[in-house]
Curated annotation (Swiss-Prot):
One of its GO terms (molecular function) is 2-polyprenyl-6-hydroxyphenol methylase activity. S-adenosyl-L-methionine binds at R39, G59, D80, M124. GO terms for biological process: methylation. Gene3D superfamilies: Vaccinia Virus protein VP39. It comes from Shewanella sp. (strain W3-18-1). It comes from the Bacteria. Keywords: Methyltransferase, S-adenosyl-L-methionine, Transferase, Ubiquinone biosynthesis. This is Ubiquinone biosynthesis O-methyltransferase. It is an enzyme of class 2 (transferase). Belongs to the methyltransferase superfamily. UbiG/COQ3 family. Coiled coil: none annotated.
C-alpha cells in the first residue's frame, strides 16, 4: 500500500476501540446518528440528487453516512483505515441488505487508480483526525470527475468550539468519549478554503450546524463558528 504516511495510529486505535457501538443509536456515536440526516440532505440537495451516482465516502468509519447514501440509490464505496469499524460497516450492510463496497485504504493510495472516477466524494468529520489535511483534500479532488462535488465537514477552532465540543459534548453532556477531539487539530473555515484553493476545487457553499442540548436536535445555521460543512466543485 502506498501513501499511507498520512495516518495517525492513535486516532485509528481510538475509533477501533469504539467500533462495536457504532450502530447503537444511544451509544457513543449517537451525535453522528442525529447529525446524519442533515449531512445526507445537504449532499443530496447540493448535487441535484445522488441517485445512480458513484459516491466515495472517505473516512467512512462504521458506515452511517455510507449506508444512508446507498439507501437513496447511490453507488457507494466506503474508505477507512480502521479494520474494526470497516468490519462493523460490512456486517451492518449485510444485515440491512445495502450494497456498499468497503475498502481499507487511505485516500491518497485509493486515488492512484481512481483518478476522476467518482461523481461525488464526501469527507465528513475526518480532516481533524489526520496529520496532513491538505494531502487528503488533494486526493479527494483527484478522485472526483470534472464538475463533480466534494463535501468536507469539520470543526472551527476557537473558544466557542472548545467550550461546546470538548467541555460540553465530552465532559459535561457525555455525548462523546473524552479525548474524541483535539482542539488544536480543528480547522478554521478560512484555513479549509485556503487548502481547497490549492486544488482544482472551488468552494460553492458553506453551512453551519448547531446542536440544542435541551431538544437534542441538530439544525442548519448560517454561523460557521463550531461545526460546519462546505460544498466544493471540481473545475471542468
Amino acid at each position: 500500500m502506498q501513501h499511507n504516511t498520512n495516518v495517525d495510529p492513535q486516532e485509528i486505535a481510538k475509533f477501533e476501540r469504539m467500533a462495536e457501538t457504532w450502530w447503537d443509536l444511544n451509544g457513543e456515536f449517537k451525535p453522528l446518528h442525529l447529525l446524519n440526516p442533515l449531512r445526507l440532505n445537504y449532499i443530496d440537495q447540493t448535487t441535484g440528487g445522488i441517485f445512480g451516482k458513484k459516491v466515495l465516502d472517505v473516512g467512512c468509519g462504521g458506515g452511517i453516512l455510507s449506508e444512508s447514501m446507498a439507501r437513496i440509490g447511490a453507488e457507494v464505496d466506503g474508505l477507512d483505515m480502521g479494520e474494526e469499524p470497516l468490519e462493523v460497516a460490512r456486517l451492518h450492510a449485510l444485515e440491512t441488505g445495502v450494497n456498499i463496497t468497503y475498502v481499507k485504504n487511505t485516500a491518497e493510495a485509493h486515488s492512484q487508480d481512481h483518478q476522476g472516477y467518482y461523481d461525488v466524494v464526501t469527507c465528513m468529520e475526518m480532516l481533524e483526525h489526520v496529520p496532513n489535511p491538505q494531502s487528503v483534500i488533494k486526493a479527494c479532488c483527484d478522485m472526483v470527475k470534472p464538475g463533480g462535488f466534494v463535501f468536507f465537514s469539520t470543526i472551527n477552532r476557537n473558544l466557542r468550539s472548545y467550550v461546546e465540543t470538548i467541555l460540553g459534548a465530552e465532559y459535561l453532556l457525555k455525548m462523546l468519549p473524552v479525548g474524541t477531539h483535539d482542539h488544536n487539530k480543528f480547522i478554521k473555515p478560512s484555513e479549509l478554503i485556503e487548502l481547497v484553493d490549492n486544488t482544482d476545487l472551488i468552494c460553492k457553499d458553506a453551512v453551519g450546524i448547531t446542536y440544542n442540548p435541551l431538544t437534542g436536535i441538530f439544525k442548519y445555521t448560517p454561523r460557521v463558528d463550531v461545526n460546519y460543512m462546505i460544498a466544493t466543485q471540481k473545475v471542468d
